[in-house]
Amino acid sequence: MPLSRLIINDFRNITTCDIQLSPGFNFVIGPNGSGKTSVLEAIYLLGHGRSFKSSLTGRIIRNDCDELFIHGRFTTPELFELPIGINKQRDGTTEVKIGGESGQKLAQLAKVLPLQLIHPEGFELVTDGPKFRRAFIDWGVFHVEPAFYDAWSRVKRLTKQRNALLKTANSYRELSYWDLELAQLSEKIDQWRVDYINHISEATQQICQAFLPEYDIKLSYYRGWDRETPYAELLKKNFERDKQLGYTVGGPNKADLRIKVAGTPVEDVLSRGQLKLMVCALRLAQGQHLTEATGKQCIYLIDDFASELDSHRRQLLAQYLKQTKAQVFISSITAEQIADMHDDESKMFEIEHGKIAQG
């Protein structure tokens, strides 16, 4: 469902704004420091409960204010409005409302508002550590497998408990009871991840062929331990080593998605502009699979659209985004950079010093 309305209060340099949105393309135009990224950041906060720019709540609440508030409205397929909102206070308190009901969990907010973010720091998905690619995989599994969230939360708790027990256990018998459940859930999570990567690999490669036809890009999934070894067996076999180290070496918390060109990691082959298109291909493939699997559309947030992309590559990306028929929010310094994407159904907003007006 696309957002039909967005209200922002006391977020960053934005005192207040209340805008009606297009179900298609929404452009936020303004000079550096004007607050255009803050609009996208507010939408991200509404769907994730956190900022993609700062982990400190105090830094995203407007100066001299005690709290921020972000409110959104959807128009459902049945044509009734569903309100959602998030309130954050300087003391760290967070309140989430869905359909007017308080006390909702952030995971429920994420289910209602599936978001894909493409921003200048987004190269981390392919260039940095495995945790970013695990988060990428798990975003997709979370949205298509209802049992994933609880299972993964349980695995993380069990692993933490196991690591604590490793410091005091004298024999493996003291861990065997906990390891039984940990192994069963870990194998289940692994299978969900395998299925998910299998589903999006073909779509990713097709989009990469359009964006980067000169490269044959391959995805491969590493589950976090040897493919031939059951996890229960690994936990037992590695007990002495894990005890010596003080933590569990292998497991689903070590999974990774390996992205290569002719056997070489993509970050060693592609330019920054090409890496951005690679990230876009992954995000678009995720959105495509979400729609195919659930009927939902994700919302795309693209900060600094022109960054690292020449006009030809911008046109390619814009073409694919239009084909998705998803709602898209794009920030840009000038209207000229997005002129060929603007149509009768899109909306353009101009922002300066935190004040927003429809262009």
Swiss-Prot record:
Show the SUPFAM superfamilies listed in the entry: P-loop containing nucleoside triphosphate hydrolases
Concerning InterPro entries, the annotation shows: DNA-binding_RecF (IPR001238), DNA-binding_RecF_CS (IPR018078), P-loop_NTPase (IPR027417), RecF/RecN/SMC_N (IPR003395), RecF_2 (IPR042174)
Q: Where in the cell is it found?
A: Cytoplasm
Pfam families, alphabetically?
SMC_N
The terms describing its cellular component in GO are: cytoplasm
Molecular-function GO term, any one: single-stranded DNA binding
Gene Ontology annotations of biological process type: DNA replication; DNA synthesis involved in DNA repair; double-strand break repair; SOS response
Q: Which protein family is named in the record?
A: Belongs to the RecF family.
Job description of the protein: The RecF protein is involved in DNA metabolism; it is required for DNA replication and normal SOS inducibility. RecF binds preferentially to single-stranded, linear DNA. It also seems to bind ATP.
PANTHER family xrefs = DNA REPLICATION AND REPAIR PROTEIN RECF (PTHR32182:SF0)
Which protein is depicted?
DNA replication and repair protein RecF
The protein's organism comes out as: Aliivibrio fischeri (strain MJ11) (Vibrio fischeri)
- Name of the gene encoding the protein in the UniProt record: recF
